[in-house]
């Protein structure tokens, strides 16, 4: 999977006449949980469905860093489930061709929904189709939603597919908020359930109090990265 940090790293051939174009989704994808995986999996499927011979649109996810809430509400001190490095690693496990990482700033956030879609998805990525969850919000003050995207798609000639909310057996929506609460509560079994895989923790091994030698098996102290 390729990672493009900013528009300048996106190959011009992607959206050029005769280029493959892309099937695109967009989101923070903090944790890359089961709900995210449903949308991302459909992106990969649709990219193959739209292939003609050996010409296939790339399956591309657009994500943002830093987290928008940390830009708009820096005092909130939002705990992230995963670093950008771990987020990209999880995205790379899903069969995507590329991820575009956009630096999120207040200037970027000031774009209208129409400007965002046309500048970044259509002109830059050559979007042939856009796949999103039914709770998608984008553009100035989150004024764009699924209906907005469908309207732009009809006007500009690209396909839009809305993936319905995916819920647990008890009817709760898989979400990053749920994972953060489980992490706060120390409920790692539930964290793994919502993620659909074990939770990753990255850090540097540091010297501890050497109590592990008293337990009869090796231990490691991690300083969270």
What is the predicted role of each segment?
Residues 1-22:
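Positively charged, low-complexity intrinsically disordered leader regions
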Residues 64, 104, 165-166:
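Hydrophobic pocket-lining residues within nucleotide cofactor-binding pockets
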